[in-house]
């Protein structure tokens, strides 16, 4: 790996870790509509940082993939960066939903998913990245 690529991965991984920490700050609060909106926004950012971190890691390992979440997630699964693709596919779906419209019942659903599944998947990715670097 070139020094530039290593630096780009390390920087992207740092962004992911920081965004995950900020997401957890929001999750620690009692949920109100304001906190729910914060959770969703921080989820959006963390998801973006997560798949971009996986992309940087995989490219640095020689994978040739497009820089798009729907291309990165299957390769990350095949490379065992993530143990399951299903939660990541759901995260991608929710991320797309939050970008295009606001629906209160959907926001409650997404927030619950972030609490129950997404943060666990993010934690597992972080642990795997720390283990591999």
Model-predicted segments: where are they?
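Solvent-exposed interaction patches of small proteins and small membrane subunits
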Residues: 1-133
């Amino acid at each position: 790996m070139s020094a530039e690529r290593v630096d780009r991965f390390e920087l992207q991984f740092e962004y992911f870790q920081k965004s995950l920490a900020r997401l957890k700050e929001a999750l620690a609060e009692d949920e109100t509509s304001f906190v729910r909106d914060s959770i969703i926004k921080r989820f959006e950012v963390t998801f973006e940082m997560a798949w971009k971190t996986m992309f940087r890691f995989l490219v640095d390992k020689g994978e040739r993939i497009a820089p798009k979440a729907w291309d990165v997630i299957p390769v990350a699964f095949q490379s065992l960066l993530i143990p399951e693709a299903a939660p990541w596919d759901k995260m991608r779906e929710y991320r797309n939903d939050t970008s295009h419209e606001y629906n209160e019942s959907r926001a409650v659903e997404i927030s619950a998913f972030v609490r129950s599944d997404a943060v666990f998947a993010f934690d597992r990715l972080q642990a795997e990245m720390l283990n591999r670097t």
